A protein has these predicted regions:
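Active-site-adjacent structural elements in enzyme catalytic cores
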Residues: 1-206
């Protein structure tokens, strides 16, 4: 199903429709402030395994990120951070960053990498954040952007739908997406290291 939602004013009934799909173990494709994402409810292990199969990888090696609503949401899934790190996050989020932290015990074992780390996103996109807020917990997410694919697949929701309609339960048309992924930043011991350059410029917030 292709569902149109306008970011400027997301329709509550449409958001609830998406949340019901997620609660039933469904897989969705949804807009962010960067490329479109492929996601499911963090509490549904079968849905997580399905996404991993779609990507052809094992869940524990998938480098999924958690889409959170705000900073308070983040704190449930990472180990305590220092004040410097918190101040940077407060300035940078919502925004086009994936921050890598040490994972807390609340991270499902299925998603715990050998390094015991987790990637956290608070996208500057009202549709994604409204879904997470209504759901009550994060979305486990991975990008559908593929360097081997024609670039339009990651930006045009109708093309995305045509490609993935038989593999996912719902595609949200939130308008054209970006074709630049998030900037990935590791955050350990108060130090920030750019792992992947992307849309976000962390220097603005340091």
């Amino acid at each position: 199903m292709l569902l149109r939602i306008y970011e400027e004013n997301p329709n509550e009934k449409a958001i609830e429709q998406v949340v019901q799909v997620l609660k039933k173990g469904g897989i969705i494709i949804y807009p962010t402030d960067t490329v479109y994402g492929l996601g499911c409810d963090i509490t549904n292990s079968k849905a997580i395994e399905k996404i991993a199969r779609l990507r052809g990888i094992k869940p524990e090696k998938a480098n999924f990120s958690f889409i959170c609503y705000d900073l308070s949401h983040i704190s449930d899934y990472i180990k305590p951070i220092d004040n410097t790190t918190f101040r940077v996050l407060k300035k940078a989020l919502p925004g086009p960053f994936t921050f890598i932290f040490n994972a807390s015990n609340r991270v499902p074992k299925l998603l715990s990498s050998q390094k015991k780390t987790v990637g956290i996103r608070v996208p500057d996109n009202l549709i994604a954040r409204c879904i997470v807020k209504e759901l009550g917990n994060p979305i486990v997410s991975t990008s559908i952007h593929d360097d081997d694919d024609i670039i339009e697949y990651s930006t045009d929701p109708e093309l995305i739908y045509e490609k993935y309609k038989d593999q996912v339960d719902l595609v949200i048309d939130g308008g054209y997406g970006d074709n630049v992924a998030s900037t990935v930043v590791s955050c350990f011991d108060g130090e920030f290291e750019i792992i992947r350059e992307g849309k976000g410029d962390l220097a603005e917030f340091l």
